[in-house]
């Protein structure tokens, strides 16, 4: 029957059948997507198990842990089960990593029944052991932080230690420069710094068959191939070959890292150019400090700006852009509207003026040179230029600042002409906080639980593991009472080997002196021959990372609450001149009420209000561009990381992520505008993320004149109860029931550490 002959009832039947078919297909797609998600989770679990098993291959089956801390006594009904199964650890009752059950249990949804605890609910009504038993293993791998050696000593000596220079002819310099500009990461370095790097590279000859770098070894040098042929190898297999003029090993000039490939010489008379990491850091630091000092001195010479605080002058110096004008160029034309201010850094300009609008002749008024400025009235309002400014031969370099950038940093200058342009109340609060921290005697920082000894602590369970050590849940028996703490155990030898002593002391001082409900408390510290210990507040609600892993992502209201808690912590820290530098879900914990606390201050540092620091540290997916490029950084990096965290909470993954750290850094340097946001992330959330993750630090929300209040007032937070959060009267979006003080149901399971670290007796921790 022709389509036009169909009755209304027949058409409705056809439409109904088609609708059913579409619904069936949609259901099939949803089912397949669900299966795909499950498969991805199983893959993540398998990766986690393989990684954990690989890390424990060196553990011998018969080796026993020698603990300084005393284990929790066996519970009823467990001893018999452990004696019957040789694959259970005698100390903690967990499956040994060397046993076949370890891999099977980690892949299952829960513990295998033959290995499960047999204890039942106690008469007191506590939850049974099975109900509080932690999950088997993480289904995804946690992000790891990285750090170079502390730059504190280098900053103090940056001008006193000469930077090494090595003679080269023009072709050698050009070869190195071309290799740098051909590298995705190195090409982002400023031209003036590239010249310094080229001058500081030295030549090294390498025989045929020798390795320039070896896979698995820790590196500290950048190389540029100068002559010969080289093989790129992984696990003994040749992946590629390269000739002269290629840069490689660039990750090693940022921080201590393990080489992921080998470079072997194939030809005779091979030669490379070499740059040491310490020299790279010194160059970047010295040039950065010199640039800031010069710019601030320039700005201070301008009467309109002379009353600005050191902090604001440093901020303005950050947004100054270097522009070159060829000889004869009109930088400013008389009578045109202007919105930019200029400082001459190199060269000369001629100032001319037409005496009348109709006059064909320009009268020369004077010549301006290095250190002079013009166009400053444009910072106040739209200025009609009253003269011409013309670049003289051979050209002129100017530092420029536009009115919009200036207003974002300090507000309307018209309202501040007769007073200090700095934020007086904020500066006073920061000064008082810093003096309080600086003047506080060391004895006062360790007053809580002064009579508690390391031997008073009894290990209940492991809450987490990392490269530096473990975090244990412990009971403290003292003064006729029992308290519960988290004990962070850090291997002293590993700290010394990675040159992290300065970071550990900084973490100790900052945490002992911090008093905020949004920051995990550090009560006191201990030390022995093998470890330094931090006795911390136990946050038994578990990690935000674990919740994110299990849920996939958070809804807006939950993400807003988490970010709100982080902002409260940042407001406290930044007011005291402290930057955090390691924000990520792995470092956020829930207390028993469901409030979020920041933990792990290993990368935190007190730098004051107008200073910068140069140490590369953070988590690759979260580091800001200025950290990657060694430009010097301050609290603006925390606002960048806040934007990354919002994206990860709402989407389940950070916006910049790649299998290799250097690939991740290159993605970060391309910028947030290159990221395609998923449709389920709201428009206001996307806008906030983009305003936090600006390449230029001074353009980030939170770093401008309104401070953190600018973030709190953003439309993504519309209707959020900030007063309720600050007073902790706001009901959290997730409250996780905790049966008793040692209920570890919200933590993953971890095997015993059977490798006892060597003694470390250098004495660096004498004041710990």
UniProtKB/Swiss-Prot annotation:
Lineage of source species: Eukaryota, Metazoa, Ecdysozoa, Arthropoda, Hexapoda
EC number: 2.7.11.12
Domain spans labelled Protein kinase: 457-717
Binding residues for 3',5'-cyclic GMP 2: 366, 375-378, 385-386, 421
Residue ranges, annotated region (Disordered): 114-134
Keywords in alphabetical order: ATP-binding, cGMP, cGMP-binding, Kinase, Nucleotide-binding, Phosphoprotein, Serine/threonine-protein kinase, Transferase
Disulfide bonds: none
Gene3D superfamilies found in the cross-reference section: Jelly Rolls, Phosphorylase Kinase, domain 1, Transferase(Phosphotransferase) domain 1
Name of the protein in its database record: cGMP-dependent protein kinase, isozyme 1
Protein family according to the UniProt entry: Belongs to the protein kinase superfamily. AGC Ser/Thr protein kinase family. cGMP subfamily.
Quaternary context: Homodimer.
Principal EC category: transferase
Distribution of this protein across tissues and organs: In embryo stage 13, expression is seen in a few large, irregular cells having the appearance of hemocytes or macrophages. In adults, expression is seen in optic lamina and weakly in testis.
Residue intervals passing through the bilayer: none
Region spans: Regulatory: 1-192
Family matches, as SMART domains: cNMP (SM00100), S_TK_X (SM00133), S_TKc (SM00220)
């Amino acid at each position: 029957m022709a389509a036009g002959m169909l009755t209304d009832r027949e058409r409705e039947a056809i439409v109904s059948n088609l609708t059913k078919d579409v619904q069936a297909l949609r259901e099939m797609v949803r089912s397949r997507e669900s299966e795909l998600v499950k498969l991805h989770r199983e893959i993540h679990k398998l990766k986690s198990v393989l990684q954990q098993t690989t890390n424990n291959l060196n553990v011998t089956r018969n080796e026993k842990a020698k603990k300084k801390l005393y284990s929790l006594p066996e519970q009823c009904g467990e001893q018999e089960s452990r004696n019957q199964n040789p694959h259970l650890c005698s100390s903690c009752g967990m499956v040994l990593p060397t046993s076949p059950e370890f891999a099977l249990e980690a892949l299952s949804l829960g513990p295998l029944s033959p290995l499960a605890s047999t204890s039942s609910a106690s008469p007191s009504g506590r939850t049974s052991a099975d109900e509080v038993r932690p999950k088997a293993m993480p289904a995804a791998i946690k992000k790891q932080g990285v750090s170079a050696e502390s730059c504190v000593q280098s900053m103090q000596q940056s001008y006193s230690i000469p930077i090494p220079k090595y003679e080269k002819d023009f072709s050698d310099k050009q070869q190195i420069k071309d290799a740098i500009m051909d590298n995705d990461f190195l090409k982002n370095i400023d031209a003036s710094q590239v010249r310094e790097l080229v001058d500081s590279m030295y030549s090294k000859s390498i025989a045929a068959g020798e390795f320039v770098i070896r896979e698995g070894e820790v590196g500290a040098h950048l190389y540029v191939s100068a002559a010969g042929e080289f093989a790129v190898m992984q696990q003994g297999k040749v992946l590629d070959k390269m000739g002269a003029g290629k840069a490689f090993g660039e990750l090693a000039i940022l921080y201590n890292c393990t080489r992921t490939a080998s470079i072997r010489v194939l030809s005779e008379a091979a030669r490379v150019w070499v740059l040491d990491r310490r020299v790279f850091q010194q160059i970047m630091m010295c040039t950065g400090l010199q640039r800031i000092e010069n710019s601030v001195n320039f700005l201070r010479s301008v009467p309109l700006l002379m009353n600005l605080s050191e902090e604001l002058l440093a901020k303005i110096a950050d947004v100054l852009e270097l522009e070159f004008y060829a000889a004869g160029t009109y930088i400013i034309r008389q009578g045109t509207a202007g919105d930019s201010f200029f400082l001459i850094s190199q060269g000369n300009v001629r100032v001319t003026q037409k005496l009348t609008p109709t006059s064909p002749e320009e009268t020369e008024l004077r010549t301006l040179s290095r250190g002079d400025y013009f166009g400053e009235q444009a910072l106040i309002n739209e200025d009609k230029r009253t003269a011409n400014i013309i670049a003289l031969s051979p050209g002129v370099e100017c530092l420029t600042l536009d009115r919009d950038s200036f207003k974002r940093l300090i507000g309307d200058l018209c309202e501040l002409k007769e007073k200090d342009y700095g934020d007086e109340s904020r500066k006073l609060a920061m000064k008082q906080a810093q003096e309080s921290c600086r003047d506080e005697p060391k004895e006062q920082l360790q007053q809580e639980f002064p009579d508690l000894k390391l031997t008073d602590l009894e290990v209940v369970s492991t809450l987490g593991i990392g490269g530096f050590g473990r975090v244990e849940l412990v009971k403290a028996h003292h003064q006729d009472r029992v308290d519960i703490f988290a004990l962070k155990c850090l291997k002293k030898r590993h700290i010394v080997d990675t040159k992290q002593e300065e970071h550990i002391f900084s973490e100790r001082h900052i945490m002992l002196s911090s008093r905020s409900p949004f920051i995990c408390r550090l009560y006191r510290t201990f030390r022995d021959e093998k470890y330094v210990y931090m006795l911390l507040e136990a946050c038994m609600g578990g990690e935000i990372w674990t919740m994110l892993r299990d849920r996939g992502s958070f809804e807006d209201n939950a993400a807003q609450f988490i970010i709100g808690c982080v902002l409260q912590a940042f407001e406290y820290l930044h007011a005291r001149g402290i930057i955090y530098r390691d924000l990520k879900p792995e470092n956020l914990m829930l207390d028993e009420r469901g409030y979020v606390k920041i933990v792990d201050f290993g990368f935190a540092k007190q730098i004051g209000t107008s200073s910068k620091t140069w140490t590369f540290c953070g988590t690759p997916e979260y580091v800001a561009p200025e950290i990657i490029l060694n430009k010097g950084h301050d609290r603006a990096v925390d606002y960048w990381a806040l934007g990354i965290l919002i994206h990860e909470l709402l989407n389940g993954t950070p916006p910049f992520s790649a299998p290799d750290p250097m690939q991740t850094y290159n993605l970060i340097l391309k910028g947030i505008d290159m990221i395609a946001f998923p449709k389920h992330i709201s428009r206001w959330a996307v806008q906030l993320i983009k305003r936090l993750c600006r390449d230029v630090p001074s353009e980030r929300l939170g770093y401008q004149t309104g401070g953190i209040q600018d973030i709190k007032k953003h439309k993504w937070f519309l209707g959020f109860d900030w007063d309720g959060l600050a007073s902790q009267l706001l009901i959290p979006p997730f409250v996780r029931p905790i049966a008793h003080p040692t209920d570890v149901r919200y933590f993953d399971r971890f095997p015993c550490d059977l490798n006892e670290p060597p003694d470390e007796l250098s004495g660096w921790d004498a004041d710990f």
